[in-house]
Amino acid sequence: HQLWPAFMNTYAAFPSNTDPTSGSAQTTSISINIETAGNYVLEVAADNTASFTWDGASIGSSSSTTTSSININTVSTGPHTLGISVTNNTPASGTADTWANNPGGVAYTLSLGGTVVSTSLDLVSNTTTSSNLVWHTRLGTGYAVTTT
């Protein structure tokens, strides 16, 4: 979307490229196999709000398309579950609630020492639930991405 920063345009995922599903939380979880124990950093952004869990425990939230960091310390090797819930707000009164006017999405990268081990684009093929966050926003219609 033309108003999103590069991180969102690269990594944002949402269940539809035509329906903004305003006001309705969209949830998923993904199994991430950790090969190296350590302190991980989850970089996140959302349009409009998202919350995150790690192995069922709340670890943070985002309400901005600008990235913020969530530290996940002392992660052990083996499979872990990242849970995600994203809600796209209803647009201002008088604004049509269309994808072009009101896109939604959640974006993340998980890294250890600067090496990315998982991103929200992995949701396409690796969800642990019958979730619907399997679509990346670069396929969106009704808007144009511009670079400066």
What spans do the regions from the language model cover?
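Beta-strand-rich recognition domains
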Residues: H1-A50, W54, T74-T148
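Short, glycine/acidic-rich beta->alpha junctions
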Residues: S24, S64-T66
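Short beta-strand segments within Ig-like beta-sandwich modules, predominantly Fibronectin type-III
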Residues: S58-S64
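Exposed aromatic-hydrophobic patches
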Residues: S68-T74
